[in-house]
Amino acid sequence: DGLSIYRRIVKEAKEVLKVNGLLILEIGYDQLDDIKQILNENKEYKIIEELKDYGGNDRGIICRFQGK
């Protein structure tokens, strides 16, 4: 489904991020809702900001690791 790498990054980042550390993901223009769902399933992350490119397309998401 093209999202498996995001699931892996979100899972493995927990092992290296400190509390309040940032996880910044570059995403495809049509992936925001799916990525938000992955992050929301992992309660340790809080979405801080959604980033758009100059064309107004979704291009990134910033979240904070809140700890295990």
Predicted regions mapped to residue ranges:
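S-adenosylmethionine
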Residues: 1-67
